[in-house]
């Protein structure tokens, strides 16, 4: 014990400060963020205290266990089972909820049910970097704030006691199974241990250090490997016990060092205020003005939710546990996790390339390191684990986009393209058929062949764009079969993408119904997947006899009956006809009208989606937040922009909802968007000027945005015209 105590003292002398790009913080923007938006309905957002991109999301885990409780929190539930240090936000699957604390006045039964206490939403306070609630059982006030890797709690006890309790629960989390754990007392103030679990992440390994501001009066445990422990404290009425909980992916010593570096003191207000400042700085990357307070709340809460992940998965020293289970030491960059790429390549990552270019080196280094560790780019990474969730090669369009936009530095471009090539050439998940057939045959695959083929096809198309940007003509040509393979799935009679067999014939589908999900589609229907060719929209249009035939077909998507079969995937939500905004495969579809000279239809649909499927209430999202993708769609669309094509040099023009927005695009440059004559009726763009000159294209180039300047819209009620 003395050796460990001396180590703690030694570690307190070490300081490793995470490098950050300072942004002028406008703290007034915090008033527009409500962290409870999206915590009801199907939003699945996590609620608690964190900082942008931090490892910790410290807050309540509720007793609900259904699909809508994947984050550990759903607004319909009023029972807390513990305050855990990590939570997912917006995902369709459950995990995390690790290392939970629960204060009480008396010893509680050591079970999920025994620890639970009801609460009232009236007692909740949720702000960026801060969460508070009062437990009904003992009227204990619980407050939480955080740094990157450390949670800080303040438990205020209403009555005095010689034994005020804090129970540490390593048994229960959110949807996983405990495999190994340890908790032991280091000194009069400190507990350490680890929690290993199997869940969505098959081999999650997390270490922790808990330090209290008061000496532990009694410590109760049936042994270090038992998953529950109790610490008691002497308190007077109204006094607080504070607890720091530091996390590490590498070991207990890493957790201790993270605590000593990030939170050496006990000033709760200072930590809370610094968390708020960091949030304000990130939100200030876009200084937007919208017509109503409700729109301002929706906009800035959406921007807040885009900043949760990817999140840190390393120690302050740079040490981290890689995808191969090996610990790397002293990385000069921040290793990141929570890569929900099938969702986020569509809008979240394009948004990052506009206003968060300074964060991209960590993104690039992490993607390349994961490739070295597991042989390919990540598909869905959580706590350093590849969980293989969703279809396609979704990191390919992300990395290809960074190449095309010149964000990958010259010294890393060869390795970046090599990572793309390795990922597309894997002998798994049907990929070899993309090279030989251009699609994944339905009769040799385990399912979802259409969705897999289309996702692969757009990844091949994105890789082609990266190859072209790097002058790799032979590589670009070699990718052609996969990039154009979508054509082989198109049925010209039905106008759907249909599953095909290895011999090229359509798969027999005697009960085909385009409004119903089948085993050949991922979280969607034939209606919704008929348009998933964002890398070659003109090629998709060319599959129809005429451009007007394409327009008529696109119109019919939004006019069709919204009926779904009873066992439809719950992700198919937010329906306008058969367009499903509550899930990602269709997010680009409203912008396809730009490609056929009818941008006013894009404007009408985008405004309808924004005004009816997003609100500033707990049920304000029509589908899963999906780690920022749903919110990123809103942010870009509110700015009047959207990137349809993966790995593209342009963003499509839609209909701005901002009257003015200033984007910090980096290196001291600002890109300003101004909307004149904007009213609830004036939703159609009449004129566009770029830096004072008339602009007649339905898109704006990425290079013109990051160069800084002004994009001016003149809005009106008249539709049916180009600008």
Question: Model regions: which residues?
Answer:
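Accessory carbohydrate-recognition regions in carbohydrate-active enzymes
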Residues: 21-397, 401-454, 462, 467-488, ...
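ATP-dependent phospho-/nucleotidyl transfer catalytic cores
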Residues: 459
């Amino acid at each position: 014990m003395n050796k460990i105590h001396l180590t703690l003292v030694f570690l307190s002398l070490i300081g490793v400060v995470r490098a950050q790009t300072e942004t002028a913080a406008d703290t007034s923007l915090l008033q527009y963020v409500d962290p409870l938006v999206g915590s009801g309905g199907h939003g699945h957002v996590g609620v608690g205290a964190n900082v942008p991109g931090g490892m910790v999301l410290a807050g309540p885990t509720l007793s609900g266990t259904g699909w809508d409780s994947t984050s550990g929190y759903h607004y319909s539930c009023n029972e807390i089972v513990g305050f855990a240090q990590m939570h997912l936000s917006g995902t369709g699957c459950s995990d995390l909820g690790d290392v939970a604390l629960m204060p009480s006045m008396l010893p509680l039964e050591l079970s999920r049910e025994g620890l639970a206490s009801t609460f009232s939403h009236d007692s909740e306070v949720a702000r960026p970097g801060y969460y508070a609630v009062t437990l009904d059982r003992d009227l204990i006030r619980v407050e939480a704030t955080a740094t990157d890797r450390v949670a800080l709690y303040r438990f205020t006890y209403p009555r005095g006691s010689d034994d005020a309790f804090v129970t540490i629960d390593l048994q229960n989390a959110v949807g996983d199974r405990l495999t190994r754990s340890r908790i032991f007392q280091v000194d009069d103030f400190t507990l350490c241990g680890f929690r290993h679990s199997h869940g969505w992440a098959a081999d999650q390994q997390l270490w922790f250090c808990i330090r209290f501001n008061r000496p532990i009066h009694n410590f109760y445990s049936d042994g270090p490997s038992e998953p529950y422990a109790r610490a008691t404290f002497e308190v007077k009425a109204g006094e607080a016990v504070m607890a720091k909980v530091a996390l590490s992916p590498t070991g207990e010593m890493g957790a201790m060092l993270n605590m000593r570096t990030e939170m050496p003191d006990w000033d709760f207000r200072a930590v809370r205020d610094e968390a708020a400042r960091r949030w304000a700085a990130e939100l200030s990357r876009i200084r937007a003005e919208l017509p109503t307070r409700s729109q301002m709340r929706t906009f800035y809460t959406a921007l807040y939710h885009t900043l949760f992940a990817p999140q840190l998965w390393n120690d302050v020293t740079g040490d981290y546990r890689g995808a191969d289970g090996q610990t790397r030491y002293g990385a000069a960059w921040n290793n990141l996790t929570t890569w929900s790429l099938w969702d986020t390549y569509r809008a979240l990552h394009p948004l990052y390339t506009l206003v968060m270019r300074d964060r991209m080196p960590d993104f690039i280094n992490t993607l390349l390191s994961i490739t070295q560790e597991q042989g390919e780019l990540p598909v869905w990474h959580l706590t350093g684990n590849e969980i293989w969730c969703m279809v396609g090669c979704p990191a390919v369009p992300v990395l290809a986009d960074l190449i095309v936009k010149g964000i990958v530095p010259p010294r890393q471009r060869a390795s970046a393209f090599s990572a793309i090539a390795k990922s597309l050439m894997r002998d798994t998940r049907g990929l070899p058929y993309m090279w030989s057939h251009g699609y994944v045959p339905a009769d040799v695959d385990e399912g979802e062949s259409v969705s897999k083929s289309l996702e692969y096809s757009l990844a091949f198309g994105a890789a082609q764009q990266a190859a072209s940007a790097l002058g790799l003509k032979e590589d670009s040509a070699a990718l052609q079969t996969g990039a154009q393979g979508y054509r082989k799935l198109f049925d010209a009679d039905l106008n759907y993408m249909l599953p095909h067999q290895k011999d090229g014939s359509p798969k027999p589908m005697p009960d085909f119904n385009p409004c119903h999900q089948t085993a050949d589609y991922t979280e969607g229907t034939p209606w919704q997947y008929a348009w998933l060719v964002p890398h070659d929209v003109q090629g998709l249009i060319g599959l129809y006899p005429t451009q007007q035939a394409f327009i008529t077909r696109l119109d019919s998507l939004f006019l069709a009956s919204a009926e779904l079969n009873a066992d439809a995937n719950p992700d198919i939500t937010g329906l306008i006809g058969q367009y499903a905004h509550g899930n990602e495969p269709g997010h680009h579809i409203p912008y396809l009208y730009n490609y056929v000279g009818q941008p006013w239809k894009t404007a009408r649909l985008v405004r309808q989606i924004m005004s009816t499927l997003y609100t500033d209430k707990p049920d304000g999202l029509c589908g899963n937040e999906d780690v920022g993708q749903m919110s990123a769609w809103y942010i870009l669309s509110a700015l009047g922009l959207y990137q349809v094509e993966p790995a593209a040099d342009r963003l499509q023009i839609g209909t701005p909802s901002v009257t003015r927005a200033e984007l910090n695009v980096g290196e001291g440059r600002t890109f300003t968007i101004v909307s004149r004559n904007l009213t609830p009726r004036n939703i159609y763009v009449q004129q566009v000027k770029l830096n004072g000159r008339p602009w007649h294209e339905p898109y704006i180039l990425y290079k013109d945005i990051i160069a800084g300047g002004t994009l001016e819209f003149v809005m009106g009620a008249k539709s049916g015209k180009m600008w």
